[in-house]
Amino acid sequence: MKLSDSRTINADAATVWAGLLNPDVLKACVPGCTEMSGSAQDGFEATVVQKVGPVKATFKGAVALSDMNEPESLTMTGEGKGGAAGFAKGGADVRLEPQGDQTILHYDVEAKVGGKLAQLGSRIIDGFAKKMADQFFENFSDAVGAPVAQEGTPDSEDTSQKKGWFKKLVS
C-alpha cells in the first residue's frame, strides 16, 4: 500500500520538526496510542490499540528515524505486531517546506500488512490508513500549530492563548 499527501501546518518548520521528534507529541497525535517512549536518536517504541474493520488488536512496535536533515526531511521505518491480528511494517519519507509562518509537510508512505489484516482486503486497509493519516495530521496540526485566523473575526484575544500546547512549550 502506498499513500502520499501533503498538509499545511500553521507553525514554522523548526516547531514542526521538534514535534516530529517528541514522543509526548507523537503519543497525543497517533490515534489509539496508549504508550510511546524513546527518542529520535534511539528510536521510539509504541503501543497502539486499533480496530480495522472487524479486527481489533493491540499493536506493539518500534519506529526508527534515519536520513535526518534538520529541519528539512527525515525517513521513518517501523514494524508493529498485533498478535493473531497480524502485523504492519513500512516506512515514510517526510519533507518539510517552509512557507512563511506555515510549513507544508509532504509525506510518502509505503506499508505492508499480514495475517488477518491482510485478509480484509486492500479497500478496507487503504481506507483505514487514509483515515489514520488524516486523524494524525489533524491532531499534529492542533498540537504544534497556532489556529488559522478566521476572516472577519475580531482579533482581540491574546495570540499566546491561541497557540497549540506544544508551541507554548517551545516558544
Region annotations inferred by a language model:
Residues 16-20, 26, 65, 107, ...:
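Hydrophobic pocket/interface hotspot
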Residues 2-6, 43, 58-60, 73, ...:
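Intrinsic-disorder/low-complexity, polar/charged segments enriched in Ser/Thr/Lys/Arg/Asp/Glu/Gln
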Residues 116-157:
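A conserved amphipathic terminal alpha-helix motif
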Residues 52-56, 114-124, 128, 157-158, ...:
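Alpha-helical membrane-targeting segments
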Residues 80-127:
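Beta-strand/loop substructures that line and gate deep hydrophobic ligand-binding cavities in soluble
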